[in-house]
């Protein structure tokens, strides 16, 4: 049975999304087929008041969910680096959680180290190694752009590997 997984890389300025379809083989000898359904970003302008930016994320994420019809959503967990950046990302994550709740969608969360480990076998891999693994695993000619979309596909793949 096909499974649709939507990966999300939350952010206020740019929220990356990447959706994959996973179809298990009929027998143990047949491998799972994983395909890219869609990927991209939702952007908000720094010139707009933060409340309106959050509304834009919310509305646009609803549109993405309605179009892609995921079975499960995978989200990158919040990474603490600078307090001001962490607060802004936490606000965007709150909007994401609200949208998922309104769609009655189950979700899983992964730390950056878990994602790196799942895709490269090394929890301290750098961004380029993860992006190359995404392109290789999904049989893409190029690394998905922008980076936020590639990161979201990495989150979706991690969810698939954990199922």
Swiss-Prot record:
The active site is at 9, 76, 148. The keyword DNA repair applies. It catalyses: Endonucleolytic cleavage at a junction such as a reciprocal single-stranded crossover between two homologous DNA duplexes (Holliday junction). The keyword DNA repair applies. This is Crossover junction endodeoxyribonuclease RuvC. Mg(2+) 2 binds at residue 76. One of its GO terms (molecular function) is magnesium ion binding. One of its GO terms (biological process) is DNA recombination. Mg(2+) 1 binds at residues 9, 148. The RuvA-RuvB-RuvC complex processes Holliday junction (HJ) DNA during genetic recombination and DNA repair. Endonuclease that resolves HJ intermediates. Cleaves cruciform DNA by making single-stranded nicks across the HJ at symmetrical positions within the homologous arms, yielding a 5'-phosphate and a 3'-hydroxyl group; requires a central core of homology in the junction. The consensus cleavage sequence is 5'-(A/T)TT(C/G)-3'. Cleavage occurs on the 3'-side of the TT dinucleotide at the point of strand exchange. Keywords: Cytoplasm, DNA damage, DNA recombination, DNA repair, DNA-binding, Endonuclease, Hydrolase, Magnesium, Metal-binding, Nuclease. Homodimer which binds Holliday junction (HJ) DNA. The HJ becomes 2-fold symmetrical on binding to RuvC with unstacked arms; it has a different conformation from HJ DNA in complex with RuvA. In the full resolvosome a probable DNA-RuvA(4)-RuvB(12)-RuvC(2) complex forms which resolves the HJ. One of its GO terms (cellular component) is Holliday junction resolvase complex. SUPFAM superfamilies: Ribonuclease H-like (SSF53098). HAMAP family: RuvC (MF_00034). Its cofactor is Mg(2+). It is found in: Cytoplasm. It comes from Nostoc sp. (strain PCC 7120 / SAG 25.82 / UTEX 2576). Belongs to the RuvC family. It is an enzyme of class 3 (hydrolase).
